[in-house]
Amino acid sequence: VRIMPHREKGEGHFAAEFVKEEETGKINIGCPQSADKETEKIYRAFERENLNVRLDGRFVSFGENLYLAPQNVPDLRGIKCLRPGIFLGEIRKGRLVPAHHLCMCLKAEDFKRTASLTEDELCAYRRGESVFRACENGFGAALYGGRYPVGWFKSSGGQLKNHYPKYLRG
């Protein structure tokens, strides 16, 4: 391939040739921080109570944070990894507090509890305020336009307690 700099648009060009020195064989998919069975049970209990979908993959934990990585994730030892998969939530006092990332990767029909918010309720929700609405107790998704998840709420006694991340409020 010939690239003539005076004929192509762009600020520069880069070309590289990679040479495979040896056959690597099978990839070691062992993950040193795989979550223990108890952590997986806590997540599955949350899933049964609050979601209509079952997520499959490899559960990975970094401290109290639980992630769902693809099944074929390679060995992460020695690699700085921002997020090895979907951030499911944080394990606190033997239960899962769901992460905003989990809510954003699901569809409206994947939640057992939903609340379609009006424009005014959505503005209040995004400011961090609670919304008053009758709903079964537990975690659910606040929806925009009845279809698009905006974030989590926890329903208790007719009040949808806001679980919208503080760093997104405004």
Kindly give the residue locations of the regions a language model identified.
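Core SAM-dependent methyltransferase catalytic element
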Residues: 1-30
